[in-house]
Amino acid sequence: MEAPDRNLGFLLHDTARMLRKRFDQNARHLGLTRAQWQVLAVLARNEGLHQGALAEMLEIEPITLVRILDRLQASGLVERRLHPTDRRLRLLHLTEAAHPILERIHEVAARTREEAFAGIPPAAREQLVQMLLTTRANLSGRNTTDDEQVRYG
């Protein structure tokens, strides 16, 4: 019999894939692509980032991000502002119109989490989240923070 953690990487990857797929199904009515709502979600936590930093955080190419931002700006959800001291940089900010959409994204995320955690007691959910945060911190060389616990818990 195989050790339970032998296929951990595959299990985590497959579970994350299924979670993304279910979220996409639940969020379809919002009219945003996964890439668009990911940009909005990251900007909500990191208002005022420049495009290069955002691309790095999302692990996408800058040119790909530019196309996503162009669509979000055309939809009135994101604005690019000049950096106060570096004219080459544009700082990214959410517009007021983005906030109600973010609320709906959070509602979809909560519903998706409830579907994923169905049948798992709250204490076990918390334990799972804590173990994943610790595992991620071990691999990234960072300590977990209270902010991360709130964001993922």
Set out the residue ranges of the language-model regions.
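N-terminal leader segment of winged-helix/HTH proteins
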Residues: M1-L30, E96, D146, V150-G153
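Charged, amphipathic alpha-helical coiled-coil/dimerization segments
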Residues: R20, G48, G52, E56, ...
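Key DNA-contact positions within bacterial/archaeal DNA-binding proteins
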Residues: A35, I63
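C-terminal regulatory/oligomerization modules of transcriptional regulators
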Residues: M1, P122-G153
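Residue at a beta-strand N-cap/secondary-structure junction
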Residues: W37, E47-G48
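Pre-recognition alpha-helix immediately N-terminal to the DNA-recognition helix
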Residues: L11, M18, R22, Q38-A41, ...
